[in-house]
Each structure stands twice: as structure tokens, then as C-alpha cells.
Amino acid sequence: MNPAPNLVMIGPMGAGKSSIGRRIAKHFNLHFADTDHAIVERAGTSISTIFKYSGEPEFRRLEREVLHDLLNHENRLIATGGGTILDPENRHRMQKRGFVVFLKINVNTQLERLAHDRYRPLLQQTDRKQVLSDLYATRQPLYQKIADMIVTTDHMSPNTATAQLILDLTAHWQKSSNTA
């Protein structure tokens, strides 16, 4: 099983962190937590409202608090928001308290998956492709830097990606326990 206290899913919006994460958590009998949902619960309002009235810095502060609290537990699968990686403290905590899986996706697949999504504050722009490309350029190196495992989810259904990730995680953890 996972040698780290938690399993942490990172990656851009639309990569499948929540949908795949729920399935993985169920398979490995982990408690599932989504940082965006936890932020909404803590703030008592939507992420869009937080961005609109309090700004992105306040959202990132709440995100840091929520992630810190979630990582203080064990046996959790934590699906993070796409921008969680931007904070150096978050990156450090995720590496220290989790096995980090980067769900990688290209911008064109993101556009397809997010075509009907009108709720993400960072996508409330006319040129979504440019926004996603800019976010990709900024965040991709950070995702790769802290990832213990990278899985590309382009052209995979959530079920296929889940099955592949279960195989990859099981093989990795068995290998880790055999060398320990």
C-alpha cells in the first residue's frame, strides 16, 4: 500500500483529479477530499463568489489553509485545485505528506472537457485556449517538479484512466515495499 500518509492528485482543471480521484479512493479504501469543495464549505460561498468579492489572493489563502488541514490527516486521497501548486508552502507540504500523482492533459483536451463549464473563475475569458495555454506554461514545470508519478489522461475516459492508475500505483507501491 501507499508508503506516504496520503495520496495527492495534482494537475490542471479538466485532467480528472476529482472524478478519477473518487474512484481511486474507493478502490484503495481512502477517504476522498476535494480542496475546492472544502474551500466552499469553509467559506460558505462559491469559488466564483470568493474570486469576485475577495479576489484570488483570498482564495489562495483559504486553499492553503484547507490543504494544510487535509494533509494533517492520513489515508486520504486529496484532489487539489489546478492552482494549488503555485504556493511554495503547498508544494512542500504535498511532497512531505503525500504521494503526489500528476494527471497530465494537453490544452486541446482541456478545452474539449471544459467546453460547457461556466463556473470556473479563471475561464471567464473570451479566449479560453490562450488562458489555458498561459496556465499550462506557468504550472506545468511545478507539477512535474513535485510529482512522484505522472499519468497522461488525454484521450482516456475516467474509467480507463482509473484502471490504468490503479495498475500503476499498485505496481509502484509493491516495488517500494519490496525494496524497503
Curated annotation (Swiss-Prot):
Compartments, record wording: Cytoplasm
Gene3D superfamilies the record matches: P-loop containing nucleotide triphosphate hydrolases (3.40.50.300)
Cofactor note as given: Binds 1 Mg(2+) ion per subunit.
Residues noted as binding Mg(2+) in the record, renumbered to the chain: 18
InterPro entries: P-loop_NTPase, Shikimate/glucono_kinase, Shikimate_kinase/TSH1, Shikimate_kinase_CS
Protein EC: 2.7.1.71
Cofactor: Mg(2+)
Enzyme class: transferase
UniProt pathway annotation: Metabolic intermediate biosynthesis; chorismate biosynthesis; chorismate from D-erythrose 4-phosphate and phosphoenolpyruvate: step 5/7
Signal peptide location: none
Keyword Isomerase: no
Binding site for substrate: 36, 60, 82, 139
Keyword Cytoplasm among UniProt keywords: yes
Pfam families for the chain: SKI
Database matches in PROSITE patterns: SHIKIMATE_KINASE
HAMAP family listed in its UniProt record: Shikimate_kinase
Family: Belongs to the shikimate kinase family.
General function of this protein: Catalyzes the specific phosphorylation of the 3-hydroxyl group of shikimic acid using ATP as a cosubstrate.
Quaternary data: Monomer.
Protein name, as recorded: Shikimate kinase
